[in-house]
């Protein structure tokens, strides 16, 4: 066995396990907690049962409050029963406590509530046990005593029978309510949260091992099977060349998916500023919430794409949201693997995250990815519209039901998850762009001839419900005049991958870039400007409230575009933003 190739051993083991599982048809998973859950999938049960920093969970704290309410409410009813007879409070206390008899006094009902309170608080709040046995004993003892009390109490000698009956029934119901709440709410929700949290904080081997032993039917769509890393290979081997080819193909697939999302028409406006910059959002099944920022930048499209893609290691110099940014593997001139560390956000609630991304960039012409020869020809000849364009593949819309995308033969196929788009009819080209910039009807192509407003107005306003009524009534200073954009779009994309050379750091939480990308659209007659569209969908891992995550992501996007404009101004001053020459 020691002389066998590790890849052969692994393949044999996977085949044996898959065949064994296929014979066990009765095996069904209720849910797969090992999959990379999005922040959007965190349930209320998890939030209620989660014990942050070792503190008491919300659901257990409510149980302790319920037990306290039991004692206080029973005591209040007892006071009403003894005072309503007309006796002085001290005389009533003397009869009920000092001269106590089980036949005439109701103080024993309060005593049972006190004992129940002390026992439950001691075991479930102080000792923090997670078993139903104690609550079962306390409830059983309380109910047995109350039932016995009904038979031995002297009801004929009582003056306020109604209140005394209410006192006993209330104590009985509260005791059973505590037992039900602990057994059906506290214990299940805390166990669910612990299981969920262990899954999210498991080591790197967990998501690499478990998906490998699941057959296709047991594996949920977009599971971590798409994101576990490859086995190490010897340097300068033939397998490295094959791996580079797979990374290249994976980058092209991710480019197409990012372009599909950018071109989709089901975006909802979230924020709009006075320069016309907009932030949209949309919801995708199995992915979560995706954001898109649209802005106009006074810089050539290709030059801006090259600066952001090829000079990524310089990004921390002008983007304060990044602590570190570097290329860890160069695959080819338009594909690489990068490592980035972001600063915290959300008022300190979102800590620093690090990301390992597979990036790719290409030129799209009429919705198709162009090869190197076509890219060079299109870049050198703007006016030739009769080119015989042999592009690598067209971008097709993927419906919600298209979930059986074949995986690459290697485990690096992390971007093979399907990004479903809306099933509605396809919008006219650039209609989304026009709507985001407030134009009434841009038709198949749009124009922008005016200069952008001053760069000191980055205040965003909530769009939400009123955006539909205001989209067609935006004033002239906020909407550039109509013009044409070229059919050429420079697109970059990024998706998270597992890369053995960059293991998770204990200093940061490893985030997941589900999908992100930029589209740089050229403008006819304005070669020194372009339209930038940025889509972003992240899984930051860990527990982050939804409203905090939304605020942090939208704020980071607006800060990024503001810093990008400042960076572009510096580039123009240095002479690096000259418009490309045309023939």
From Swiss-Prot:
* Alphabetized Gene3D superfamilies for the sequence: 3.30.530.20
Q: Which GO terms describe its molecular function?
A: cholesterol binding
Can the keyword Signal be found in this entry's annotation? Answer: no
- MENTAL domain residues are 56-227
Parts of the chain on the Extracellular side: 85-104, 154-161
GO CC annotations on file: endoplasmic reticulum-endosome membrane contact site; late endosome membrane
Q: Where in the cell is it found?
A: Membrane
**The protein's name in its UniProt record:** Steroidogenic acute regulatory protein-like
Q: Which gene encodes it?
A: Start1
